[in-house]
A protein has these predicted regions:
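Basic side chains
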Residues: 39, 53, 68-69, 90, ...
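Basic/aromatic recognition patch in beta-strand/loop cores that engages polyanionic ligands
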Residues: 50-84
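Basic, Lys/Arg-enriched alpha-helical interface segments
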Residues: 1-63, 107
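Enriched for short, Lys/Arg-rich terminal
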Residues: 27, 72-76, 80-107
Length: 107
């Protein structure tokens, strides 16, 4: 079984920090915030093996770029697979217009 290095971009880390802050501070639920953060972080770390088990985006140009999406609760982890490396680019709230958010950030 091939193992991949999982690289999390600064932008994805900022997304995770923002989701933690939103739940902990704005929703006043710090325990829930930590639980959600930990579930996402744990799921991201599983991308070190078989990262292609999650589907590609259906829309373009993300599909052609090889951008995958992994759903964790109400959040979507966006990532690309290169030889030996999985790069997590975004962690987005699933209820948002995902295609538009990715387009705004990367194009």
């Amino acid at each position: 079984m091939d193992k991949y290095i999982v690289d999390i971009t600064d932008e994805a880390l900022a997304d995770m920090d923002a989701l933690y802050q939103h739940i902990a501070v704005e929703l006043k639920a710090p325990e829930n915030a930590m639980g959600q953060y930990n579930r996402i972080a744990k799921a991201i770390l599983t991308l070190d093996s078989f990262p292609d088990r999650y589907g590609l985006f259906e829309c373009e140009p993300e599909h052609s770029m090889g951008m995958h999406k992994m759903v964790i609760d109400n959040y979507i982890v966006c990532y690309v697979i290169d030889p030996g490396v999985v790069t997590v680019t975004d962690v987005l709230y699933g209820a948002s217009d995902l295609h538009k958010r990715v387009q705004d950030r990367h194009f």
